[in-house]
């Protein structure tokens, strides 16, 4: 399956939304939104995409698949499942990083006893959509702080030209790379033209509540 085929899978489930004013988690604005939540409704689609995500890696090369909440929970499960389908022995585990609920700077951490499965292990970090790579970078830093070896970062979509240098100098693999125009709020032409901010998708509601 080539990039066109994968993009068609995104389109078929309504995961590509255009013609509105979106605010990304990173705080940047755009007229295009990759609605990853639309993908998670379709288990067959997510399974097929995760199978593609782990193709570059040998099964025995990955001990644990890690994803940040919330989407990373689903991705880590399916990615580990498909790695285990190819393994001849042993097991690849799937765990997720949570975000602290206290304080303004909500950092990722491993709760529920998951931290014990990181040290000395080869880790594949999975993410749905990369814009700045900030969440993935935080997870990578936490994994390294616990003594894990990050083999790579694998994503469904790289929409922000995220490079290895942006995420701690690890390999970045993405099923599709989309070159989208994004803007800082102060430079956003949609804001200047008073295009209403979409409050149903993205972080528009939080942006307007500031």
Where are these regions (language model features)?
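Short, well-ordered alpha-helices that flank and scaffold nucleotide-derived cofactor binding pockets
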Residues: 51, 55, 77, 81-85, ...
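Short, glycine/charge-rich flexible loops or terminal/linker lids adjacent to PRPP-binding catalytic cores
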Residues: 77-124, 134
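Conserved acidic residues
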Residues: 63, 121, 151
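Active-site-facing substrate-recognition patch
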Residues: 1-61, 202-210
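PRPP-dependent phosphoribosyltransferase catalytic core
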Residues: 3-9, 140-210
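Short glycine-rich phosphate-binding loop at a beta-alpha junction
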Residues: 61-70
């Amino acid at each position: 399956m080539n990039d066109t085929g994968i993009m068609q899978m995104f389109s078929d489930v309504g995961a590509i939304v255009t013609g509105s004013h979106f605010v990304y988690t990173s705080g940047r604005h755009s007229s295009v939104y990759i609605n990853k939540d639309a993908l998670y409704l379709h288990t067959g689609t997510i399974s097929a995409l995760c199978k593609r995500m782990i193709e570059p890696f040998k099964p025995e090369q990955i001990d644990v698949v890690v994803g940040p909440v919330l989407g990373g929970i689903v991705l880590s499960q399916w990615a580990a499942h498909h790695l285990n389908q190819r393994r001849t022995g042993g097991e690849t585990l799937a765990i997720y990083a949570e975000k602290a609920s206290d304080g303004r700077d909500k950092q990722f951490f491993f709760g529920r006893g998951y931290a014990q499965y990181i040290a000395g292990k080869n880790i594949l970090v999975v993410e749905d959509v990369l814009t700045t790579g900030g969440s993935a970078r935080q997870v990578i830093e936490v994994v390294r702080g616990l003594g894990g070896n990050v083999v790579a970062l694998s994503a469904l979509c790289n929409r922000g030209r995220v490079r290895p240098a942006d995420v701690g100098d690890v390999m970045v693999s993405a099923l599709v790379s989309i070159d989208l125009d994004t803007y800082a709020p102060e430079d956003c032409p949609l804001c200047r033209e008073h295009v209403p901010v979409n409050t149903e998708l993205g972080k528009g509601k939080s942006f307007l509540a500031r």
